[in-house]
From Swiss-Prot:
Gene3D superfamilies registered for this protein in UniProt: Erythroid Transcription Factor GATA-1, subunit A
Role according to the record: Transcriptional repressor. Binds to multiple sites in the eve stripe 3 enhancer element. Plays an essential role in the segmentation process both by refining the expression patterns of gap genes and by establishing pair-rules stripes of gene expression.
Family: Belongs to the nuclear hormone receptor family. NR0 subfamily.
Subcellular localization, as worded in the UniProt entry: Nucleus
Name listed for the protein in its UniProt record: Zygotic gap protein knirps
Species in which this protein is naturally found: Drosophila melanogaster (Fruit fly)
DNA-binding region per UniProt: 2-78
GO biological process, one term: epithelial cell migration, open tracheal system
Annotated stretches, region: Disordered: 112-148, 223-250, 338-357, 375-397
Biased composition (Polar residues): 225-237, 338-349
InterPro entries linked: Nuclear_hormone_rcpt_NR3, Znf_hrmn_rcpt, Znf_NHR/GATA
SMART domains: ZnF_C4
Record-level Gene Ontology MF annotations: DNA-binding transcription factor activity; DNA-binding transcription factor binding; DNA-binding transcription repressor activity, RNA polymerase II-specific; estrogen response element binding; nuclear receptor activity; zinc ion binding
Length: 429
């Protein structure tokens, strides 16, 4: 590259952080810029010499020199460039060498680099101005002319960049050596035109454009997600379609009709049971059988406590017939009739239970009255009657009370007389 590092003087590796630097100074500036607090103050009051040998002795002076040569964190990092960039560097070196020598090298046609004819007198004669003086004079004159003219790009000075020349060939690197007036150096151009695509402003603009596009995409995606969520929230949930199993064998039309009838019957029964919960009986259901049940079995189903003291009393159970529905009633009245019939059956069952509970008491009081009358009559005629008559009365009483019969509960024969049976019923009730 034939460029030296502006900090330590070592051969430069590229254009880093706004200046030509070597790899060591580039890395040092990148590390030190973010960790300035770790760098201690200079012990030599900032008078250290930074060169290739002792550049690592004082970090404070080295960082100060990096700032002095124009390095900054916002500067572009171009790194190693191609051949055309090296040509620019060679041109700059040539100009620097010519300015340092103070004379212009003559060309083949007797014309100097600045465009003025070379004199036959020696190069160092006092009558012939040097190349540096002539270039400075012409450059100052051209700047005055440029200030008098209206700038073609008035917005560039506001951004901190030098204004362009009126000549469009000034922006080209090789035309600066062809005219009679030393045009503006290509290194005085704005950085975004000198190296397009690598400048910090161009990178920032590209990053902002990419960020804007990303935000727009995320906004659209969020809108679509919100619309889907609101639609699922406020719309009824769609039930999954019921897949009916298809039989491998082909069914006949008669089988299909039978299956539809069975399905309709089951669906009607299930809907009736779901829509009419009042039809459920609150009382335990009585088993229906062809033979009449005994009173003891009835009481066992109703109250298990009274089974232990129930005697041989047997009563006939009044059969409960379900309400009949006429064939002329429509299907809409079926639910109404079902609920009413269930209410009536509930009331009837309650009245039957009350009747069953009252019947033993009533019979007990009747038998007590008969026993009292019989005992009074037997006491008045006890002297006149024989023991055979007494046994006959006892037999009649036993038959009335039904004590001679035995009732089976769970395989055991329980025989009680009328008095013990009635006493047990009275206590349990």
């Amino acid at each position: 590259m034939n460029q030296t590092c502006k900090v330590c003087g070592e051969p430069a590796a590229g254009f880093h952080f706004g200046a030509f630097t070597c790899e060591g100074c580039k890395s040092f500036f990148g590390r030190s810029y973010n960790n300035i607090s770790t760098i201690s103050e200079c012990k030599n009051e900032g008078k250290c010499i930074i060169d290739k040998k002792n550049r690592t002795t004082c970090k404070a002076c080295r960082l100060r020199k990096c700032y002095n040569v124009g390095m900054s964190k916002g500067g572009s990092r171009y790194g190693r460039r191609s051949n055309w960039f090296k040509i620019h560097c060679l041109l700059q070196e040539h100009e620097q060498a010519a300015a340092a020598a103070g004379k212009a090298p003559p060309l083949a046609g007797g014309v100097s680099v600045g465009g003025a004819p070379s004199a036959s007198s020696p190069v160092g004669s006092p009558h012939t101005p040097g190349f540096g003086d002539m270039a400075a004079h012409l450059h100052h004159h051209h700047q005055q002319q440029q200030q008098q003219q209206v700038p073609r790009h008035p917005h560039m000075p506001l951004l901190g960049y030098p204004s362009y020349l009126s000549d469009p060939s000034a922006a080209l690197p090789f035309f600066s050596m062809m005219g009679g007036v030393p045009h503006q150096s290509p290194f005085q151009l704005p950085p975004h035109l000198l190296f397009p695509g690598y400048h910090a402003s161009a990178a920032a603009a590209a990053a902002s454009a990419a960020d804007a596009a990303y935000r727009q995409e995320m906004y659209k995606h969020r809108q679509s997600v919100d619309s889907v969520e609101s639609q699922n929230r406020f719309s009824p949930a769609s039930q999954p379609p019921v897949v009916q199993p298809t039989s491998s064998a082909r069914q006949s039309p008669i089988d299909v009709c039978l299956e539809e009838d069975v399905h309709s019957v089951h669906s009607h029964q299930s809907s009736a049971s779901l829509l009419h919960p009042i039809a459920i009986r609150a009382t335990p259901t009585t088993p229906t059988s062809s033979s009449p049940l005994s009173f003891a079995a009835k009481m066992q189903s109703l109250s298990p406590v009274s089974v232990c003291s129930i005697g041989g009393e047997t009563t006939s159970v009044v059969p409960v017939h379900p309400p009949t529905v006429s064939a002329q009633e429509g299907p809409m009245d079926l639910s109404m009739k079902t609920s009413r019939s269930s209410v009536h059956s509930f009331n009837d069952s309650g009245s039957e239970d009350q009747e069953v509970e009252v019947a033993p008491r009533r019979k007990f009081y009747q038998l007590e009255a008969e026993c009292l009358t019989t005992s009074s009559s037997s006491s008045s005629h006890s002297a006149a009657h024989s023991p055979n008559t007494t046994t006959a009365h006892a037999e009649v009483k036993r038959q009335k009370l039904g004590g001679a019969e035995a009732t089976h509960f769970g395989g055991f024969a329980v025989a009680h007389n009328a008095a013990s049976a009635m006493r047990g019923i009275f206590v349990c009730v």
